[in-house]
């Protein structure tokens, strides 16, 4: 492909600052950006990235369909929320316009077990319009692979212990809410902590009913 890859950014919060910068650094062309925050709508994406003017204005998310039709990006990077239910609209509008899409949404890494109905619907939509919808998700698999590789070279393992820590302030509101930031102890236990006591069968039953939100396990 001799021309530049055309990219749209859906969601212009904290993570998009890095995502859009990566797009520009790698020589792609940023052609559209969408968000729901009235404080940044209408501004050049440079106000989020912190660079010289790019010439691309942040548009309201509800105008994505028309703008995707007009700009015809090759791919859309979605960085909004953490569950498939929350991502369904963004994925759908991309698929209907034959735009490939990838999301940072944790659940989108492999949503077939946790949100089967939504995933089947989006899968059919993507196939109908000849595009790909996928997720990068949180790299749990990456951390597990590191440990697996190290364990493979060991003759005897007594115990494996690992931890991951980060400041949720560095990420968006979705991650903060998924971790229970701002909740009282009682609210945290009710909304998040109680899920840790569920059996795999109980979780499976809730998933089938559409009542279980994967990010509640955080």
Question: Positions of the model-derived regions?
Answer:
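Active-site-lining helix/loop region of Rossmann-like oxidoreductase modules
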Residues: 5-6, 10-14, 150-218
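N-terminal glycine-/serine-/threonine-rich beta1-alpha1-beta2 phosphate-ribose binding loop
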Residues: 1-96
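Short, small-residue-enriched loops and turns at beta-alpha junctions
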Residues: 82-84, 108-113, 140-141
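Rossmann-fold NAD(P)-binding glycine/threonine-rich loop
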Residues: 92, 106-131
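Short, ordered loop/turn segments at secondary-structure junctions
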Residues: 36, 105-109, 138-139, 165
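Short, hinge-like loop/turn segments at secondary-structure boundaries
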Residues: 48-52, 120-122, 151-153, 178-180
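Adenosine-phosphate binding glycine-rich loop
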Residues: 129-158, 165
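A short hydrophobic/small-residue beta-strand
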Residues: 100-101
């Amino acid at each position: 492909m001799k021309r530049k890859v055309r990219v749209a950014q859906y969601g212009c919060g904290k993570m998009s600052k890095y995502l859009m910068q990566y797009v520009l650094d790698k020589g792609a062309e940023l052609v559209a950006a969408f968000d729901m925050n009235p404080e940044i709508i209408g501004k050049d994406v440079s106000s989020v990235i912190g660079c010289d003017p790019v010439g691309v204005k942040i548009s309201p998310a509800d105008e994505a369909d028309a703008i995707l039709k007009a700009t015809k990006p090759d791919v859309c990077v979605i960085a909004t929320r953490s569950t498939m239910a929350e991502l369904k609209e963004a994925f759908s509008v991309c698929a209907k316009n034959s735009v490939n899409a990838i999301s940072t949404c944790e659940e989108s890494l492999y949503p077939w077990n946790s949100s089967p109905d939504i995933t089947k619907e989006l899968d059919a939509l993507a196939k109908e319009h000849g595009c790909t919808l996928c997720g990068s998700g949180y790299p749990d698999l990456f951390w597990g692979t590191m440990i697996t590789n190290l364990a493979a070279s060991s003759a005897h393992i007594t115990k494996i212990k690992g931890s991951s820590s980060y400041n949720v302030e560095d990420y968006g509101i979705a991650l903060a809410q998924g971790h229970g930031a701002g909740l009282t102890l009682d609210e945290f236990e009710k909304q998040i902590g109680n899920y840790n006591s569920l059996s795999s069968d109980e979780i499976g039953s809730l998933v089938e009913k559409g009542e279980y939100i994967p990010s509640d396990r955080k």
